[in-house]
Amino acid sequence: MRPSEGISVSDAIRSRRSHRHYLPDPIPTHTLDRVLELTLEAPSAWNYQGRSIVVVSDPDVRAGLEAATGGQPHPREAPVVLVFLAEMDAWRRDNHDVFHSARRSGAWSEQFIAGSAESSRTFQQDLLERGLEREYAVKDAVIAASFAMLAATEQGLACSPMNGWDETQVKKVVGVDDRTDIAVALLLPLGFAAEERRHPGRRPVSSSVHYQHYRTTLTDTSGRIS
């Protein structure tokens, strides 16, 4: 797979596969920069952008990620691994740059900015009291990772979202083992595919899409209810 810039979103979604093996070829800097730029266009709660990406290309650091994933080949073979981190304290920090950018572009009014600042504090405090702050932050980081997968596919790169790893080890490898306010959301190896992966198929829409209410019965491929 090589750069295919200009493909449609639909084509990127349908052609993306999860690759376990990669060529040793480095990713051109401009290609990686493009993927990162598009990734950071992902939406986030209150636009606080409480997610960070650690770009890991050093072989020794990737070896640490390989160990943290139980010896899976992706982090070792891929020239780059993106580690998506969720920042649970994003709402507590100074977000005036976010407000300034939205004000300057005309996206947010002064009234909306004032309301958002107050509402976000109340909302996040409620999450904290219910023990949901981590879960909420991880969602934002995973949304960004989804954007990264599509951006990588558009640029002709292969990738594979990884959710099987030891978080304590991953945090130590990327230097945040002392940060209780940061959680690991996802690992995403990137590179040029060394294998062809065929589409394994998906269940029909009728078995996964529900209207108005969730139903416990499933429709098989023949249309029968089971």
Language-model regions: role of each:
Residues 1-226:
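Acidic, surface-exposed loops and disordered segments
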